[in-house]
């Protein structure tokens, strides 16, 4: 009777352990997916900010270029 009780208990616990292991693996995968999604969002945000900064730099350079053109044309006249 003890052997059969042990066997039944063992056979009941094996699937439980397997389910727990599978659950942990799924949680790890979800965490990795969340981390990757966050990294992508951060990268996109950084690219957008970099684009804005570059756009402002180009505007300032164009203004300086126009000022230099105006200055040179006044000097030539």
UniProtKB/Swiss-Prot annotation:
Any one GO cellular component localisation term in the record: extracellular region
Q: Which Pfam families match?
A: FSAP_sig_propep
Q: What are the UniProt keywords, alphabetically?
A: Amphibian defense peptide, Antimicrobial, Cleavage on pair of basic residues, Secreted, Signal
Localization per record: Secreted
Functional description taken from the UniProt entry: Has antimicrobial activity.
Stated family: Belongs to the frog skin active peptide (FSAP) family.
This chain's protein is named Distinctin-like peptide
């Amino acid at each position: 009777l003890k052997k059969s009780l042990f066997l039944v208990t063992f056979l009941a616990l094996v699937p439980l352990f397997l389910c727990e292991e599978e659950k942990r693996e799924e949680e790890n995968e979800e965490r990795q997916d969340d981390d990757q999604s966050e990294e992508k969002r951060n990268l996109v945000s950084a690219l957008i900010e970099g684009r804005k900064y570059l756009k402002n730099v180009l505007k300032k350079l164009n203004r300086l270029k126009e000022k230099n053109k105006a200055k040179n044309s006044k000097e030539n006249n």
